[in-house]
Amino acid sequence: MASYAQGIDALNQSLSEVKGIDVSFEFFPPKTELMEKTLWKSVERLAPLKPSYMSVTYGANSGERDRTHDVVKRIQAETGIKAVPHLTCVDATREELIEIAKDYWQSG
């Protein structure tokens, strides 16, 4: 009987060999230091599968917005994989949303 780790490795190998199917991964911005370590271990493990992009959820409060932005920029910088933020229009003015979008565009 295959172990859980062997099953995951087999699935990862299968995904890396699939052609014609776009795969992406979604992450939540970390709220604690432990969650941040887990996030980056996950990104490192999944990046070799060459997903079309990695997305990061986006909360309405400014602290989570900043964490989302930091994660998106770091994913792109460290992996070269497109990173896509979720944008939430709740609790933000039109002007704030324009500035947030401009910042993402300028970051690549």
Predicted regions, residues:
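Acidic, glycine-rich active-site loops and adjacent beta-strand->loop/helix elements
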Residues: 60, 89-94
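Glycine-rich, proline-tolerant flexible connector loops at the mouths of alpha/beta enzymes
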Residues: 30-31, 50-71
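Alpha/beta enzyme core
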Residues: 17-22, 31-54, 77-78, 94-108
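N-terminal amphipathic alpha-helix/helix-capping segment at the start of soluble metabolic enzymes
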Residues: 1-25, 32, 76
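An N-terminal assembly and electron-transfer interface module characteristic of large anaerobic redox
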Residues: 2-4, 66, 105
